[in-house]
Amino acid sequence: APEVSFSRKMREDEAKSGIPASLLLQYGMMSLDYVLRVCPPGTRITLLTELDNRTDFWLRDLAYIILPNGECLNELLIRNGFAKASHSYHCIHLHYFQEICRLAQLEKQGIYQFSNIF
């Protein structure tokens, strides 16, 4: 999902996308708002990790977040246009996530209402 604070990664994202950091920050806040609506603080979640893909380039932990109703928060974020699937974050479901990401883009879901890239 987009970043919610100015950081080195946001400056990299700004350079790659051509979108000003201030706008990327707004997109990040939109994604955060969606997460808080779907999974408010205190929600019990289950984290599932892949042994071969536990961290990303920045050594952040990667996991599938399973909600109490069994839905995957990662999938919901992508399907609703508040996160994107990137080849930079390999996982066993990458192809599926890229497909639903493209659908969200075509259907102008979430952030895609404002920009085709983020």
Feature annotation, model-predicted:
Residues 1-82:
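Electropositive
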Residues 87-118:
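N-terminal targeting pre-sequences for secretion and organelle import
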